[in-house]
From Swiss-Prot:
Encapsidates the viral DNA into characteristic twinned ('geminate') particles. Binds the genomic viral ssDNA and shuttles it into and out of the cell nucleus. The CP of bipartite geminiviruses is not required for cell-to-cell or systemic movement. A motif (Nuclear export signal) lies at residues 96-117. It is found in: Virion; Host nucleus. A motif (Bipartite nuclear localization signal) lies at residues 3-20, 195-242. InterPro entries: Gem_coat_AR1 (IPR000650), GV_A/BR1_coat (IPR000263), Viral_coat (IPR029053). A motif (Nuclear localization signal) lies at residues 35-49. The lineage of its organism: Viruses, Monodnaviria, Shotokuvirae, Cressdnaviricota, Repensiviricetes. This is Capsid protein. Residues 12-23 have a biased composition (Polar residues).
């Protein structure tokens, strides 16, 4: 004698529910990921206590929002003797790219661009390394000092550059990196991408002047030094440098 069909089978438009179906709101809808990715992106409550207690604040201590930004877009001709530019030049004003008063804090620096060679230079068989130094000038005065006056080098080689002993209290190297380009007819690499993002938390102080110039700094100016290793072949760098800063509460 055949068994009688269950009630839900006789009702039109209904189907038996699968036991393997997961109707939880936390169920993953997209493609499944591996356990390593789940562990890296685990929620904060599953991480150790030190991750929750030592989180850095969005706004630096002693500052107020909103986060402001200043960009420096320029093409640089980098030679063996070096070059310097100030990246903390901010004009006084009320805009999103201006400082309100004398004091502000540069929270982070973003450097984006590329290093490239000229059409005539890239055909020569050579390798050229370009080095960058992000330096804090604690007591700026006058004009920025040249690369050779700040750094001590062996045999005038920029790859061996270190801050001179009598200037170590004034100039502090925060970060350093380099990029390499290679010239030649065959295995050449005539350009290299530059992409760096650093948290510096540098508190800059200006005088009573409104113009954003190095000569108006009184404390903690940010300088970017650049130099290449090849003595005769220069290198070009097309860079976009952005600083993200907050105004100080002491203004």
């Amino acid at each position: 004698m055949p068994k009688r069909d269950l009630p839900w089978r006789s009702m039109p438009g209904t189907s038996k529910t699968s036991r393997n179906a997961n109707y939880s709101p936390r169920a993953r809808i997209g493609p499944r990921v591996d356990k390593a990715s789940e562990w890296v992106h685990r929620p904060m409550y599953r991480k150790p206590r030190i991750y929750r207690t030592l989180r850095t604040a969005d706004v630096p201590r002693g500052c107020e929002g909103p986060c402001k930004v200043q960009s420096y877009e320029q093409r640089h001709d980098i030679s063996h003797v070096g070059k310097v530019m100030c990246i903390s030049d901010v004009t006084r004003g009320n805009g999103i790219t201006h400082r309100v008063g004398k004091r502000f804090c540069v929270k982070s620096v973003y450097i984006l661009g590329k290093i490239w060679m000229d059409e005539n230079i890239k055909l020569q068989n050579h390798t050229n390394s370009v080095m960058f130094w992000l330096v804090r000038d604690r007591r700026p005065y006058g004009t920025p000092m040249d690369f050779g006056h700040v750094f001590n080098m062996f045999d005038n080689e920029p790859s061996t550059a270190t801050v001179k002993n009598d200037l170590r209290d004034r100039y502090q190297v925060l970060h350093k990196f380099y990029g390499k380009v290679t010239g030649g007819q065959y295995a050449s690499n005539e350009q290299a991408i530059v992409k760096r993002f650093w948290k510096v938390n540098n508190h800059v102080v200006y005088n009573h002047q409104e113009a954003g110039k190095y000569e108006n700094h009184t404390e903690n100016a940010l300088l970017l030094y650049m130099a290449c290793t090849h003595a005769s072949n220069p290198v070009y760098a097309t860079l976009k440098i952005r600083i993200y800063f907050y105004d100080s509460l002491m203004n």
